[in-house]
Amino acid sequence: MKQGEGHTIYMLGIGGIGMSALARYYHSQGYIVAGYDRTPSPLTKQLENEGMAIHYEDNPNVLPALIDIVIYTPAVPRDLKEFEALRRRDLPILKRAAALGKITENHFTIAVAGTHGKTTTTAMVAHILNQCGKSTTAFIGGIANNFDSNLLLSQEKESVLVVEADEFDRSFLQLHPDISIINSIDADHLDIYGDRQHLVQSFNDFANLTEKEVIVKEGLGIVTDRGICFGFGNNNDYKTTIIRSEKGITDFVIQSEDSTTEIRLPMAGQHNVLNATAAFIAARKIGIPVTDIAEALTSFKGVKRRFDIRVNNKKHCYIDDYAHHPEEIRSCLTAVRDSFPEKHITLVFQPHLFSRTRDFMNEFATVLALADELILLDIYPARELPIKGISSEALLNKVNVNHKRICKKEELINLIDNEKPELLITMGAGDIDRFVEPLENMIKTW
């Protein structure tokens, strides 16, 4: 009998990338899983096809009669009618982070943290372990192309658990990591933390939760006696040197006190080389030989919406990316320039959150100017209300690009079809992802 047999878990915001992975995990453990989300999506349809009941109307009358546990995402508004009805039923109610934390209590856990790069790094660690025959369960904050899922599920009880550790709302402090990775700390979520100093402190708190090694990129300000430092500098425990990078393939070397390993990564960008270095160290620390790790990385296929090359033919190229912070945008556009130095870059960017746009207005303006042509969609509000004076128009006025414009979402497909850009990038963390398949299919007909 499976552990969840006969018990029902109800999930508010079940269609989110993190929530849907949890839903799949609980379903695999025998739980009856049902939930609510605001709108249908390809992911919710997949969950329904896997046997989970989902509805899209905030209606307490359709709640299951028997519920054992409620799990919610912070993205769900507290005044949701269903949420209020569930609280009145005096049920155990857990945040997603707390639920994931309970799972990590019972497994050897590798937790991947960082304001950028954690999804790709988590997928890399999971792929290496899986490829090298290590029993692995992984919760990934995106759809890993090697698994075509955000959940890698081991059928064995004694599996290694790999999880993405989210700093938003200090969620990662609910986890119980044995090995942790911290690969970036840039100012973000200032609505939660106030300033970078408090953000760094939270990452230090996360490091101190770690039982064994803390694998940390150089220069982040993490103070721990269990740290293993990596980066391009000479004084690191693991020093990485890029040999060459062309046509989306990067060759590099990782040197440590006792080994030198050459690696070919089928990805562009210095940031991805550092992600791979962190994954390499984590795999090595649980006993996987360096030659096996290097071999596994050659077959890593990336994550959907992370430098995701959707079309690349003689006439046109289309790349989709989740970047929504200035440093992520810089990394992506730099990698595109390195991979396609002769091409004219048209960027469609959907700013994510009024607060983030306000806090980094000048930084966004600087990095968006790395494109040759800029198309801005309206700000995606997510959980926020508008902020006076903060708009895509205000941002556009600050960007020093000759060809720039605002575009309504309903006009985007026609605009792109008329312009037929040589190299198109769609970018953002909002609902811009709904355009990816239509754009891909259209560009393939040009």
In which residue ranges do the predicted regions lie?
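Conserved N-terminal Rossmann-fold NAD(P)-binding element of oxidoreductases
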Residues: I9-I14, M427
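Nucleotide phosphate-binding/pyrophosphate-handling subdomain across enzymes
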Residues: K2-T8, G18, Y25, Q29, ...
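NAD(P)-binding Rossmann-fold cofactor-contacting core
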Residues: I32-Q46
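Short acidic/histidine-rich motifs immediately flanking catalytic phosphotransfer sites
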Residues: A65-I69, S159, K420-E422
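Phosphate-binding loop of NTP-binding sites
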Residues: K2-G6, Y25, Y31, E48, ...
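A glycine-rich beta-strand to alpha-helix segment
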Residues: E411-M442
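C-terminal helical cap/extension that packs against the catalytic core
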Residues: I228, A365-E422
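Beta-strand->loop->alpha-helix junctions that form or flank phosphate-binding loops
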Residues: Y36-D37, H55-D58, L94-A98, F139-G142, ...
